Amino acid sequence: MVRRIDRDQQRFDKIIKGKVRQQLRKYINHGEMIGRKGRETVSIPVPNIEIPHFQHGEKGSGGVGQGEGEVGQPIGRGKGEGDGPGQAGNERGQHIREVELTLEELADMLGEALELPRIEPKGEDALTSQKDRYTSIRPTGPDSLRHFKRTYKRALRRMIATNNYDPKDPFIVPTKDDERFRSWKTVTEPHTNAAVIYMMDVSGSMTDVQKEIVRTEAFWIDTWLKRQYDGIERRYIVHDAVAHEVDEDTFYRIRESGGTRISSAYRAADHIIKRDFPPSQWNIYCFQFSDGDNWGEDNSDCIENLKQNLFPICNLFCYGQVRSPYGSGDFIKELRKVEEEFDNLILSEIDDKEAIYGSIKTFLGTGK
Amino acid sequence: MVVTTYRPLPKELSDIQQEMEQHALDYGLDFFKTIFEVLDYEELSMFAAYGGFPVRYPHWRFGAQYDELMKGYSYGLQKIYEMVINTDPCYAYLLSANDITDQKLVIAHVYGHCDFFKNNAWFSQTNRKMLDQMANHATRMNRHIDNHGYEVVETFIDTCLSLESLIDPYSPHIRRTQKTETRAETKKRTDEESESTGGRFPAKYYMDRYINPEEVLEEEASQKRQKARELSDQMKFPKERMRDVLYFLIQYAPLEDWQRDVLTIIHDEACYFAPQGQTKIMNEGWASFWHSTIMTRHGLTDEGLINYADHHSGTMATSPNRLNPYKLGIELLKDIEERWNKGQFGPEYENCTDMYQKEHWDQDLGLGREKIFEVRRIHNDITFIDTFLTPEFCYKQKMFSFAYNDSNKTYEIQSREFQQIKQQLLNSLSNHGRPVIYVQDANYKNRGELYLEHEYLGVELKLDYAQDTLVNLHTIWKRPVNIETVVDDRPTILSYDGKKHSTNSKEKN
């Protein structure tokens, strides 16, 4: 039977999720989520869920308390915690509600809000992959896979059958023959593979604010793509004058400085793709973020590299240029020159945090 | 059938319950039959979320409340030990996880509440069959949901709840307004009045100043003006300002029948719960007084002592920025009992200036017990504090008043002076700490606008909430709505016309 309260609670749950949806832009634009990555759910503070009343504000308010203290001594901020002062401990204080959401739910909301199309995998859409599933039982195997319940059940059966079982002294000792082990079957599943390569400029002209914007955007793009593909592989590249492949954690934390040579990142990306992701089998996405302040002579090198190696094999090549107080912002002009030729090249200029939301839509709105 | 989870008390508890009940009766407590049930925390939270009532209409805020209670419990921030509802018979729910000493304490505490519900004057008008009433409300609400859809009704409930505190908590006890005249009656009366006004008599011109003397005409004209003024006062609607805004809306707002019914349900339930808000300090104080009396004299075993002391002191804990109603209530009752036992009251005592004599004043009157029973019968929190709070008590209890300092956004200790503390306490308690708001005019500017007035007592309204509330008020009144209040120390009218908000300083009359 459904309890009355469950129904009311579910309704409440729906309402707060609706609130999150309304304010999604705020959550997307601020990088609060990133630290929580890796957990299954994220907690999001949702203020103002309560019903408004005519009620007293702080101005002119006060109350009566008990305890030591001199006149003029502060007794704590009024807002936020527990019962509000001035109400003789009766009125409920203001609570910030936290709603628990999975990242998938958030990704769906994002998709809905930005009207992102489902991504259609290119090429052979029914690639198969093999997966092991522990679904069967067999009489041999390593101890770590021993199925205790089955083992003891068999032992009990044997002891009863051989009249060795005494219910008053219920000892069960399995023998080798009684042991049973979990076992796997290898199943083949249709699978769409996607490889995503994130490139970030970490040179001196990229300030912490810019990096923060890049990370926030990369996080949401990643969350969305994860939702779209069963198996998604990610690689991370950071570069200044030279490029390094780094792990995800480093990508989200690193601080660097130095000059800028974008082509180094492209070479690294090309290298990774050749090494790990044969383009015939993978949907490949590249997301590059920079303030566009490249070392001048490097630009032609970059374009050449892109035309030769990356454009031909990528589903999408997305370049996001973050506005920086120091960078020249010239690089995007170079790409604009070839924009017409390649319909998988997408450009976006990100002025500030508020622009992240729109930029995500620019990148992912094509549905490729 | 209403209480679906009903499980009789296990033998061990039912023995304790009978023992505690007997103690309570021996001390002269007088209560309705009290039915105890043991619930686990989930069930108890569920009941608590519904205000103690197992059957109520569906609404998300009950779910929100439940969510909060369960979370608070799992994080170890709070715990409900019991819950009692004011009905006849009384229902009391005990937490199954309480240990045996807790159960004793809680049962004794419950009998205190039950006695209070039955005997305190402020509860005398509450519906003791509220279980049935709540279930009826649920049925009516569900019918509206069937007819109009869940979300439509839910949204309207939200709107009504936004106004639920705008009731008159004294309305069951006082008749405030005369019967309102119907429109037909007004017309008949004003027609008659307008005909009766005189004028010049016909007269030849040379006789005119004798037949129609100037002064008399003047006088008549002035009377006529006076009548007209009175008449326009009668057109003012409502004639006197009305405290129960919600009731006013039920009567006069242009609502559909089902909406009027929803608003009526919200109004009736708010009125039912109002006395609990008016007597929080007394009610909790009274229940605590009895659990501590019964437990310390009869209920304690050696092994239960520590648990009792722990639980009791937890309940009595004080904090600087929040007054504990349990603590204030029990201490004040104890103080009254002692004073009336020793005769520390009346003019002779009040006027005594010898501090030593005053402190050791003891006439051995033994009137204390009788006195506190009288107190629990007739007082609410405000009259209780107003009558019995003394400077000695404030000093002993280390009480102080605090105030919000706008410059550093902090609450600060303001004073330890008796008069200030008392005044602040009474202010905080007035109308349960909520602003007092009246319907001043329902035909404001002669355009059917609603004009409310906030009775400003030094604390300003929270502006953003006030604006949101005006929007809800507009949903019901369907014409522009206004509230007169004080913003930044200036009399101000906040208005909402259905599209936009405006804030105007009140022009001087």
Give, region by region, the residue ranges found by the protein language model.
Chain B
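Post-HExxH zinc-binding segment in Zn-dependent metallohydrolases
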Residues: 117-185, 284, 288-301, 314-325
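Long, internal scaffold/assembly segments composed of regular secondary structure
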Residues: 230-330
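Short pre-active-site segment immediately N-terminal to the catalytic Zn-binding motif
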Residues: 69, 89-106, 274-282
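Auxiliary, metal-adjacent structural segments of Zn-dependent hydrolase domains
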Residues: 3, 11-90, 213, 217-253, ...
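Extended, Lys/Arg-enriched charged tracts that mediate electrostatic binding to polyanionic substrates
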Residues: 43-70, 173-203, 218-219, 224-227, ...
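Active-site His/Glu-centered metal-binding helix of metallohydrolases
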Residues: 107-116, 290
